[in-house]
Amino acid sequence: KIMDKIPFDILENEIINKGKPFLGICVGMQVLADKGFEFGEHSGFGWIGGVVNKIISEDLPSIHIGWNDIEIKKESPLLNGLETIKDFYFVHSYVFDVESEDSIVAQTNYGNNFSSVIAKDNIYGVQFHPEKSQKAGQLIFKNFMDT
């Protein structure tokens, strides 16, 4: 279990109490949830309310692999400069069903809409892989470093 392998109390103190910026990528975004169901039911960090569930689509494979656009729902420093570049690389079979619409920054459609960028205070999560997303991904990292 991931929770058994990290000094969670130290991490939580730095992120929640001291306000250090945190960026979760792919599964790193998913662990921000209250719980997830990949390989059984597991607790997450609970920093952004919601649950991680398997992708359900009648017409598409249950694993989302490849390039897809994000639809920006609200402004966020993480997405500064991305008005014209919104294509990112995804590899996942689970999605974060976010509890509060206020935490959804962008969504993506893969059979159904899912949260692809989330944020709450100093905590950010992206379902895609910025490290594989060329210029758009570089901009995400730059924006995060500038927060």
Label each PLM-derived region with a short phrase.
Residues 1-65:
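Cysteine-nucleophile active-site neighborhood
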Residues 4, 12-17, 51-147:
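Amide-donor transfer/coupling interface in amidating biosynthetic enzymes
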